[in-house]
Amino acid sequence: MRRVSGILAVAAFTISAFAGVIQPVAKDARDSAELDVKLTQVDGTVIKAVVTNNGDKDLNILNLNFFRDTAPVKKVSIYSQGVEVPFGGIRVRHKTSGLSSDVITYLAPGESFEDEFDVAITSDLSQGGPVVLQTQGYVPTTDTGGKTLSGVVRYKSNKLEIDVDGTTAAKSFAAMNQFVKIAKLSSCEGSQGDDTRRALRDCASLSTLAAAQAWAGGPKMLEYFKANDDATRKLVADRFTAVALESSNLTGGSTTYYCRDPYNICTNNIIAYTIPAENLISNCPIYYTEFDNVNRKCHGQDRVTTSLHEFTHASSVFSPGTKDIAYGYNACILLSTRDALNNADTFALFAQSINAGC
C-alpha cells in the first residue's frame, strides 16, 4: 500500500549531493568539449576515476550525480556475464539555478580531478566473480558564475574488469540495505501535506494528458523520443498511464511517498529523491519553498513534474523503472529512442511541455 508520509530526518549517515538537471542551452552538446574518464581498481570493489578535460575550453562541472558526489548515486554501469547488475542506490532531482559552490568543480583544459568510490555499496555483487565497469553520458556544466546550469559535456570511460570477492561485497551492500530500513513512518500534515496532495492530483491529470498526447503521436514524440511508431507511442503512453493511476491513489498503490525526508538525504540543492529498490519517494524542503505547483515556462521545474519524474523511477509503478541517463532539454533530445524511453527527465519534460504549451 502506498502511503503519503512525512517524518523529521532520521539517518544512519548523512548524504550531501545528488542528481543533476540541465537547463536549455543554445549550443548542441555534441559540440562541447569531451571529458575522458579513466577507471582503475584501488582495492577490491573500490574504484578510482580520473576525469580529464580533453577540450580547449574551461569547464565548470556539476558533481551531483557524477564523480565527486558523496552520495550513493550511480557513477558506473556494472556488467556480469554481459548483463547489467541492477542499481540499488538513490536517484534524485535537484534545482538548476542557485546551486552552491561546493557541488561545482572547475577544470581548465588538460586538468583533471579524482574520485574514489565503492561500487559494492550501490549494487549487489554478492555472487562475486568477474565484472566489467564502464560509464558514458552527459554531465551538466554551469555558467561562469557557477550558480546556474547552462550546458552539457559528453564523457566516456574505459572498460575496467575486476574480480569481486562476493562475501566482502555483500557486507558493503548490506550497509545500504540497513540505511533504507531504519525510518519510522508517519502521515503528511499541515501545508506540506496539502501541497503534496495537490501536486499528486495534478500529476495524475497531467500524466493522463501526456498519455493521450503520446498515443496521438506527432512532432512532440519525435522531439523527445525520436520515434513515432505504434510500439514507441504505446510504451510512452503506458508509462504515463501507470503514473496517473499511482499518483491519483493517495491511500493505496505500490509506492510510499514522504512529504518530509526520512533519511537526512536532502540538501539545499535537492528537490526530491527516489530509492528504487524500496519504491520509496520523498520530497525535500525546497520542493515546497522554491518551486510552484506548476511552471508555465518551457522546460521549467515544478512540484508536479518533479513528482512525475520520481514516479517513473519506481519499478512498482511501471517496470522497468527509468534511469537518470540525461537531465534537461538539451541533453535529453540527444538521446536515442532506447535511452529516451528509459530516462526519467525525458518523461518529465515531455509532460511539462504540455502544461507550458511549448
Swiss-Prot record:
Cofactor: Zn(2+)
GO molecular function per UniProt: metal ion binding; metalloendopeptidase activity
Reactions catalysed: Preferential cleavage of bonds with hydrophobic residues in P1'. Also 3-Asn-|-Gln-4 and 8-Gly-|-Ser-9 bonds in insulin B chain
GO cellular component: extracellular region
Source organism superkingdom: Eukaryota
Keywords assigned by UniProt, alphabetized: Cleavage on pair of basic residues, Disulfide bond, Glycoprotein, Hydrolase, Metal-binding, Metalloprotease, Protease, Secreted, Signal, Zinc, Zymogen
Presence of keyword Disulfide bond: yes
Protein's cellular compartments: Secreted
SMART domains to which the protein is assigned, alphabetical: Aspzincin_M35 (SM01351)
Residues that make up the propeptide removed upon maturation: 20-182
Active site: 310
Cofactor note: Binds 1 zinc ion per subunit.
Annotated SUPFAM superfamilies: Metalloproteases ('zincins'), catalytic domain
Cross-referenced InterPro entries: Fungal_M35_metalloproteases (IPR050414), Lys_MEP (IPR029463), MetalloPept_cat_dom_sf (IPR024079), Peptidase_M35 (IPR001384)
Disulfide feature: 188-259, 266-284
Gene Ontology process terms (BP): proteolysis
EC numbers for this chain: 3.4.24.39
Signal peptide boundaries: 1-19
Keyword Membrane belongs to the record: no
Residue positions the entry lists as glycosylated: 249
Sequence positions that bind Zn(2+): 309, 313, 324
Function summary: Secreted metalloproteinase that allows assimilation of proteinaceous substrates. Shows high activities on basic nuclear substrates such as histone and protamine.
Family classification: Belongs to the peptidase M35 family.
Protein known as: Neutral protease 2 homolog PABG_02362
